[in-house]
């Protein structure tokens, strides 16, 4: 392979490091922050040079789709298969949860974190501390399987009357539903009807 410049080597080594530790490559923004480049176009330029020199392969149709080209120096890298899962922003009543207008971005998720059909999976960014006693923290990403039913004790994503998604523990009581926070300082939400849009099946947290 052709020789790399100092900056290209920094970027290449950073990509390898992230792949080794996380199982998937970093974003362009993360690469720039790691090597001190503020311009994403400059990072893209270096990635193009790395691709031309045969060190990486990229898929322009997918975010973060950077593949380390195997050679004698990196045969020991185990790059885990990833799926690109929609990250849902605003949830609109009457619109399927994964409708285009609800999707903010796609996130590369290690395949082992899902256990069902990929098309049924979406991600919500957690805001707030209502579920901290279940180990779900502000800023976490919850991995959700689309479904409209739930069993008592399930952690679900439900639609509020304000058309916002909320993550709570689900309970069906005699004449009402209870959405229970996992935070002893917060009160439960009682509803006559509840719109379940998914069950939390996993959690992803940036270290």
Curated annotation (Swiss-Prot):
GO biological process per UniProt: DNA repair; DNA replication; negative regulation of DNA-templated transcription; proteolysis; SOS response
UniProt enzyme class: hydrolase
Annotated keywords: Autocatalytic cleavage, DNA damage, DNA repair, DNA replication, DNA-binding, Hydrolase, Repressor, SOS response, Transcription, Transcription regulation
Self-association and partners: Homodimer.
Positions marked as site (Cleavage): 93-94
Binding region for DNA: 28-48
One matching Pfam family: Peptidase_S24
Keyword DNA damage among record annotations: yes
Family statement drawn from the similarity comment of this UniProt entry: Belongs to the peptidase S24 family.
CC terms in the record's Gene Ontology section: protein-DNA complex
Catalytic reactions of this protein: Hydrolysis of Ala-|-Gly bond in repressor LexA
UniProt xrefs under InterPro entries: ArsR-like_HTH (IPR011991), LexA (IPR006200), LexA-like (IPR039418), LexA/Signal_pep-like_sf (IPR036286), LexA_DNA-bd_dom (IPR006199), LexA_repressor (IPR050077), Peptidase_S24_LexA (IPR006197), Peptidase_S24_S26A/B/C (IPR015927)
GO molecular function list: DNA-binding transcription repressor activity; sequence-specific DNA binding; serine-type endopeptidase activity
Protein name: LexA repressor
Lineage start: Bacteria, Bacillati, Bacillota, Bacilli, Bacillales
Its job: Represses a number of genes involved in the response to DNA damage (SOS response), including recA and lexA. In the presence of single-stranded DNA, RecA interacts with LexA causing an autocatalytic cleavage which disrupts the DNA-binding part of LexA, leading to derepression of the SOS regulon and eventually DNA repair.
Domain of life: Bacteria
Catalytic machinery residues: 130 (for autocatalytic cleavage activity), 168 (for autocatalytic cleavage activity)
EC number: 3.4.21.88
Cysteines joined through disulfide linkages: none
């Amino acid at each position: 392979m052709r020789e790399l410049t100092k900056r290209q080597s920094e970027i290449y080594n950073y990509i390898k490091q992230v792949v080794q530790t996380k199982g998937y490559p970093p974003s362009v923004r993360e690469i720039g922050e790691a090597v001190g480049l503020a311009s994403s176009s400059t990072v893209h330029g270096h990635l193009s040079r790395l691709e031309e020199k045969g060190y990486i392969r990229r898929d322009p149709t997918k975010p973060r789709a950077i593949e380390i080209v195997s050679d004698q120096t990196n045969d020991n890298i185990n790059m885990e298969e990833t799926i690109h899962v929609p990250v849902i922003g605003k949830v609109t009543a009457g619109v399927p949860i994964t409708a285009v207008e609800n999707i903010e971005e796609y996130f590369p998720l290690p395949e082992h974190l899902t256990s069902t059909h990929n098309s049924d999976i979406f991600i919500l960014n957690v805001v707030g501390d209502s579920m901290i006693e279940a180990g779900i923290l502000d800023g976490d990403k919850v991995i959700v399987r689309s479904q409209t039913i739930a069993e008592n004790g399930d952690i679900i994503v439900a639609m509020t009357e304000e058309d916002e998604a909320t993550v709570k523990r689900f309970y069906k009581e005699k004449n009402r539903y209870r959405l229970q926070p996992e935070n002893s300082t917060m009160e439960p939400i009682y509803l006559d009807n509840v719109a379940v849009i998914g069950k939390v099946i996993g959690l992803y947290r940036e270290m």
